[in-house]
Design a protein with these regions (language model features):
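Surface/interface-facing alpha-helical segments and adjacent flexible terminal/loop regions used
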Residues: 1-194
């Protein structure tokens, strides 16, 4: 149960960064004990005004420093543009099927990395409830859903995202954040689930 709460906190933190919700980021970090804050390498570079400006430059305003925050912008091993379009439609269907309307409420596209991590947060909340209620069958379904989202939508585009960011991301907060995000989604998330 403790791991689920930890993953939920991390997913909420990642979501706040992807969406540039600095008020929420600061609220979350206030609750993080100092020793754990030091493990979040990006946090030592946090200066709200700078980070807010560079967030817009990196993830919102197209230009020299722009890095797309949308999974459908990146090629995957298997795919052409048609495959990415199908993946996007499947993701939208998944959101509708589970009643996840956060991207619409936030006026964001469903394939935004912030939307994906917000969805993982939503799944984590459901997992916590299922575990508390002793509903092992529902918990297993949720764990499979969580793994599917990671394997189908996030992990295949981590390397292309980092390659694009390598030359464009200048601010150390975001350099460290992207490294942390990649490591968490490729390794840490899975380890925390086990």
């Amino acid at each position: 149960m403790e791991e689920r709460y930890g993953k939920l906190a991390i997913a909420n933190l990642l979501t706040s960064i992807w969406f540039g919700d600095w008020k929420r980021y600061e609220e979350i970090m206030e609750d993080v004990p100092e020793p754990l804050q030091q493990e979040l390498s990006f946090h030592s570079f946090y200066k709200r005004d700078e980070v807010q400006l560079w967030h817009d430059n990196h993830f919102f305003i197209p230009g020299d420093h722009f890095v797309s925050p949308y999974f459908s912008s990146y090629p995957t091993n298997s795919g052409d543009e048609e495959d990415r379009r199908k993946d996007l439609l499947c993701l939208i269907g998944l959101y509708e099927k589970t009643g996840f309307y956060y991207p619409l409420e936030q006026d964001r596209f469903p394939d935004h990395f912030g939307s994906l991590t917000a969805f993982l947060s939503s799944v984590m909340k459901e997992e916590i409830e299922a575990e508390q209620e002793g509903d092992s069958q529902y918990l297993e379904q949720l764990e499979e859903l969580e793994a599917d989202v990671l394997h189908q939508y996030i992990q295949p585009v981590i390397r292309p995202l980092l390659q694009q960011a390598e030359m464009k991301v200048k601010h150390p907060f975001f350099k460290e954040f992207l490294r942390f995000y990649a490591d968490m989604m490729e390794n840490g998330w899975v380890e925390a689930a086990e």
